[in-house]
Structure formats: C-alpha cells, structure tokens
Design a protein with these regions (language model features):
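Amphipathic alpha-helical polymerization modules
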Residues: 1-134
Length: 134
C-alpha cells in the first residue's frame, strides 16, 4: 500500500480504541442527562450529542468532533414544574435511552475487537521473536 509504510497494526487498532472511547464518553453523557430539565422556566434542556469521526488514511490519526443533535425535544404537560413554560409544558432532552444503549453496545464491541487485534499482534510478535532465537 502506498503511503502506509511504517504504520503498524497496533497503531491502527490503538486509534480505533481512541475513537470508541470518544463515542462511549458522549453516549454515557447523553444517558446521564436523559431526564434532566432546563434550569429556567421554558428553557431548553440538555441536547443530545453525537460523536462524528472523519475517515482517514491508515497513516493518519482519526479526527473527530462532537455535534448537537437538532431533533426536537420531547415535551410533556407538567404545570407547576419549575422548568415548565407559561402553558405548563416541560421540555425534556431529545435523548432516547434505548438508542444510546444500542450505541454503547456497538461501541463496546468495536472497542473489544480493537483490543483483540492488539493482543493478537502482540502474540504474533512474541512468537516471531521466539522463532528468531532458535
């Protein structure tokens, strides 16, 4: 492969680990705030975040950013709630816990796969060194 000389499988898997860590961090924050409300009457509650990573070549570090999900907030009638608006409507975060849990499971699976790649490469390197000792 042109342009990928000197890039190890371990480095690629380690980059994959960092990507999944970022995804996990964002999704756990979303879950932690799934039932939060605004701090002011009629204000906006927590807005779901999404980790977005740009595809890069094998020899580059993945770049990512966190964007806000622009889907609408959930709303319920809660007259008298300190964060409800004048009509008694309370806005809730646009976080779906089931979606976040599914994303967490996928990210954990990808994280574990990258760990297995690193362990396999480490084992292969160890075996190669052992063979060279003979």
């Amino acid at each position: 492969m042109a342009g990928s000389e000197g890039v190890s499988g371990s480095a690629i898997a380690a980059a994959g680990l960092r990507v999944q860590q970022g995804r996990l961090r964002v999704m756990t924050e979303n879950l932690a705030n799934a039932n939060s409300t605004a701090s002011t009457p009629g204000g906006d509650p927590y807005r779901r975040k999404i980790a977005v990573f740009e595809p890069v070549g094998a020899d580059a570090e993945p770049t990512g950013r966190v964007v806000r999900d622009t889907s609408p907030f959930r709303s319920i009638s809660r007259p008298g709630h300190p964060a409800a608006d004048a009509q008694g409507i309370l806005k809730l975060p646009n976080v779906n816990p089931a979606t976040e849990m599914a994303g967490l499971r996928a990210a954990m699976g990808a994280y574990e796969s990258n760990l297995k790649v690193i362990a396999t490469l480490d084992d292969l390197n160890r075996r190669t060194v052992d063979l060279l000792k003979i």
